[in-house]
């Protein structure tokens, strides 16, 4: 299934993640999934949320740089080798994964 993801660009300093999450909480936006990637100076908070339009507005109002892009969601079998068998399908189809969420 295809969904829209929000990427929030953050300085890697204390309180920045909390400020972004707080901006969403104040608008009653549910975070369905998140991923954080960082370097020593900057990070990217990637989010799947309940209402992208409101989330983008709230984050921009809180002075964050944000982008929205399409991603796909795949249910992975909850068993040994479940992730591997799913990744094999992507490889067979020539689909490159840039990153992934997992739980």
Annotate each PLM feature.
Residues 1-103:
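A conserved regulatory-domain signal marking ACT and ACT-like small-molecule sensing domains
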């Amino acid at each position: 299934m295809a969904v829209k993801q929000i990427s929030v660009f953050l300085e890697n300093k204390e309180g920045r993640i909390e400020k972004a999450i707080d901006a969403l909480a104040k608008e009653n936006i549910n975070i369905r999934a998140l991923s954080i990637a960082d370097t020593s100076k900057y990070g990217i908070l990637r989010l799947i949320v309940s209402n992208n339009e409101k989330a983008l507005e709230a984050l921009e109002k809180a002075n964050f740089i944000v982008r929205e892009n399409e991603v796909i969601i795949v249910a992975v079998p909850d068993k040994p080798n479940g992730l591997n068998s799913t990744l094999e399908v992507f490889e067979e189809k020539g689909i490159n994964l840039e990153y992934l969420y997992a739980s």
